[in-house]
Amino acid sequence: MPSKSACLRHTEAPGQLEGRMLQGQLSNPEKKLIPTSASLPAADSQSSQTNSMPPLSMPAKPSNQNLQAKANLITPQPPIRPKLERTLSLDDKGWRRRRFRGSQEDLTVQNGASPCRGSLQDSVAQSPAYSRPLPCLSTSLQEIPKPRRATGSEGGSPSLWSDCLSGMISTSLDLLHREAASGGPHSRLASLRATHTPPAMDLNIASSSLRTANKVDPEHTDYKLRMQNRLVRAHSNLGPSRPRSPLAGDDHSIHSARSSFSLLAPIRTKDIRSRSYLEGSLLASGALLGADELARYFPDRNMALFVATWNMQGQKELPASLDEFLLPTEADYTQDLYVIGVQEGCSDRREWETRLQETLGPQYVLLSSAAHGVLYMSLFIRRDLIWFCSEVEYSTVTTRIVSQIKTKGALGVSFTFFGTSFLFITSHFTSGDGKVAERLLDYNRTIQALALPRNVPDTNPYRSSAGDVTTRFDEVFWFGDFNFRLSGGRVAVEAFLKQDPEVDVLALLQHDQLTREMKKGSIFKGFEEAEIHFLPSYKFDIGKDTYDSTSKQRTPSYTDRVLYKSRHKGDICPMKYSSCPGIKTSDHRPVYGLFRVKVRPGRDNIPLAAGKFDRELYLIGIKRRISKEIQRQEALKSQSSSAVCTVS
């Protein structure tokens, strides 16, 4: 039979562990402690021998002798200061782990093995002596054990469990107050985890390249204050005591700032510091015509171009509206550059340019204007792109004798935009059904006589030819009244046109003189033309949709054309090629083409236009628009005031 001290040491281990979980300070020595196996009745002694450690739910009234022995032999070990986060933790997983470990210890005890073999002596020997026992603090509110009753037991004391519970709660609350008073770390709640995987989205529109600015509900009370603070931070000087501006972030922040503060692209401070205007380079950071600046205005490096030709027949009367000509409904957006060539232009050239400026509006400025007799060419560009143009140069060619100097010839205008050189030529070739050879001669004289470029350097001199001006530029557009006709006679052409209003014009082009000569390679070498899907633009009765009804009975033909040529294949992409049947002030219908042209970065060491444009024409166009708007509003007012209600 084991000694009393050994048995006591063996049976006190569970009580000591449970005392650590609950609270073990004895405020009254007469209060009953948690019962142990030493105080069990004699009736249960047999079961105690079988199970060396009875379960905790089998309490018995302990004797005073056992209480005194416990107090003399056991000095509680001071508890470890629990962490505040763990004190407030409600993690079920940890509680299940502790319950599982406790169940394993109970099974070990029932099988005859002690769960704390030799640990109690070590803890008693190492624990310091205190004048009074310290409370055993719980590390979690979930560690409160529930009282368990064994069959046939007398039951535990209710006051004992209530005292332990109240002491534990008071100690935990005391810890909270001490932690807050000492300025310790803030309490953190346990992270929430999804219990199940959310269903897949029907459509995923996530994109790493798209990023928008954060939105705030305008109805929110502090919306104005927050927006004001953002603007102050964005435009404030970046000092050591100021908050960091959102414009000083990464590339995504710049795109977000563009949508938050201004439509203008933000400019980095470091780009300005490293920018040099003395010497240009394709790889220079911050160059005016370099890749960085080009990407700001043309991220895809493609500009929109409008090229049109119109033989005005020298009419003084201009159309009431040029919207159908310059602003066709097929185009959703306006173009970046407008180039208009006129043959047999009106006598008042300034009035013609004013009408163009008035129609395009204040968003466009006249970059250049040139004339050769009655050949006019006008270049309008978006006003924010005027700074990336070189000096504009022009040259003229006379192809006929002196008596015809004002009607036949060619006019060429060239300039460089960023790093791409452009050449625009408008021509009026010799007229007549059978004068194909004369028209070929006009073409050859033009490409040899146009002296361009002059001061602006060639972007690729190794691919240039002295005998062909079109080889000295990256992108070439040649448009005008070429006077090539449809062979076969008027009767055959009219019969073909009357067959079907939606006639396939490809059959007509088989009889086109220009198409035939281009296939031979005798004219416009290297040039291309977009597919034609409109009716012949010549010759109409003025103000009507009928072809020539005079005694000459001229054959309807595609005399007005727009051709293009590029050094690099695929740089020019035609988007639209059509005519304007609504403008009927001439015997020719205007023909236009919409293009997308690839633009490359350039160098700053070229003669720049430096924002030069026709300022006087710009102001006149604005005044015209204002005066017309006032007249329109007055007409609406007079119409509404003069309305008469009649009763029948």
From Swiss-Prot:
Residues 59-243 are annotated as: 4 X 4 AA repeats of P-X-X-P. The modification Cysteine methyl ester is found at residue 645. Sequence repeats lie at residues 59-62, 76-79, 147-150, 240-243. Residues 646-648 form a propeptide. Interacts (when prenylated) with PDE6D; this is important for normal location in cilia. Phosphatidylinositol (PtdIns) phosphatase that specifically hydrolyzes the 5-phosphate of phosphatidylinositol-3,4,5-trisphosphate (PtdIns(3,4,5)P3), phosphatidylinositol 4,5-bisphosphate PtdIns (4,5)P2 and phosphatidylinositol 3,5-bisphosphate (PtdIns(3,5)P2). Specific for lipid substrates, inactive towards water soluble inositol phosphates. Plays an essential role in the primary cilium by controlling ciliary growth and phosphoinositide 3-kinase (PI3K) signaling and stability. This is Phosphatidylinositol polyphosphate 5-phosphatase type IV. The lineage of its organism: Eukaryota, Metazoa, Chordata, Craniata, Vertebrata.
